[in-house]
Amino acid sequence: MTRVRVRGIYATALTQLLRNAGLDVVAASPPIRARFPDADLGAAEPHADIRMTPDRQGVGITAHGDDHARAVRAVVADLPRDTFVWPDPVPRGAVFDAAVDHTVGGGAILDLGDDREAYLPFGAVDDHVTDGDTLRVAIRDPAPPWHDDRPTATSTITVSGALASLDRGVDALVAGAATDRAELARATELLDPDIPDNWGVYWEYDGADASLDARGTALDTLAARADRLEATLADADGGDTPGLVAAPDTTLWAWFGRETRCALDDHRRTVAATMPGHHRIKAGSDAASDAVDFAEALGASVDEFPFGAVTDQFGPSVGASIEIQHGKPDGALISLGRGEVTDRSAENARITVEREMTGGGTYDALGVAREAGDTATTRFTEGNWWYPTVYRSEDGERKGTYLNVCTPVEVFPDAVRYVDLHVDVIKHADGAVEIVDREELQDCVADGLVSEELAEKALSVAERVQSAVAE
């Protein structure tokens, strides 16, 4: 049975979903334990960790073993069609032989081989490093594919757990974040774990509340993982060529779309009061997340996602600058720049964004010159599977309209987000209308990046939009 620990704004919904799928949820936070009073969610070492990404858009999953990774992935991938799941080529806990490509303020950029990079803070390595140095590192914090950040590396090799972790090359047997270190030190001596030589115990906060038996089981599990990693490292000669040495864990990233957040609302609603748009609002900002908790605690009731109230309170408002974050099915995210919100309709859940374009090249698929002074006027409607952008010259002449087909649009306080589905509808200045890039969508299906169901939806939307704008 796969044991999973879950943290973040999606924890309640995912706990319900995972348990319904037959997986065990362990080391749950106090609020989660309170919402599942009849479930055994106590302290235990998980096979997989699910954590909300820093931007709240999805979750990162790190699993110890392929079977456990597949079990968790199957549950997450079964969410609605605008969920995307990608493997990470630089997973948490992986060990690399690396070369310093160059240094920047506060750290070094590492070449890990095979077009992989990581950031090494100077404080995460004992020795001074400079361009061209080679060293062995472990990945401490992997990075979602839609982020610009590189994964963060450290010179300390760690076997991470929920109750405790083991650090290689640490002199002290017991250290940690937990406050009662003296009691944990006594417990460790009593348990007398068979920790590999040159590895030290680091107790996590969850370890302080665990029973002695749970602590002992956790240390035995971690020691076995450390033994396997130590054997792999012993067989790997450190060399000057960057490359992967060991990947004991698998890291996956899941991007949640609007349909998925609504489905997670439904799962959460089976165990706790959940307003419409609960996860959608919480994904916007810390302040918005706190407001949802407050409203639900008061028993506030609304019939649908309150677009007007949310944008009134948290933005975007007319005159605000907002970024267009254009996700891709392979996990990349492209910024289409920032624009000014020129109109907002609470009734229609819509904003209008205007951007001034720079000169150079042509507009994709329209085949007309992109000139300085051109404007792009885009209408984003919350929940729509497409949005239109009208391009005009400096004197107001229409150059064409690009109707982008995408996963349901989400208008967050600082950005509009969606995943582009490649197929689009083009309306030329002379009124001619065509669907473009069908082949790119089919290539994504063939590569396993887009499901057949999602591709059929995208083509259906494109055909419907084509018919509407051709009239």
UniProtKB/Swiss-Prot annotation:
Q: Which residues form a coiled coil?
A: none
User: How is this protein named in the record?
Assistant: Probable ribonuclease FAU-1
The enzyme class is hydrolase
Q: Cite the S1 motif domain residue spans from the record.
A: 93-139
Q: Which organism is it from?
A: Halobacterium salinarum (strain ATCC 700922 / JCM 11081 / NRC-1)
Q: Which family does the record assign?
A: Belongs to the FAU-1 family.
Question: What does this chain do?
Answer: Probable RNase involved in rRNA stability through maturation and/or degradation of precursor rRNAs. Binds to RNA in loop regions with AU-rich sequences.
**Entry's InterPro entries?**
DUF402 (IPR007295), FomD-like_sf (IPR035930), Ntdp-like (IPR050212), RNA-bd_FAU-1 (IPR016730)
UniProt-listed GO biological process terms: rRNA processing
Disulfide bond entries: none
SUPFAM superfamilies membership? FomD-like
**Keyword tags:** Endonuclease, Hydrolase, Nuclease, RNA-binding, rRNA processing
> Lineage, please?
Archaea, Methanobacteriati, Methanobacteriota, Stenosarchaea group, Halobacteria
A GO molecular-function descriptor: mRNA 3'-UTR AU-rich region binding
EC numbers on record: 3.1.26.-
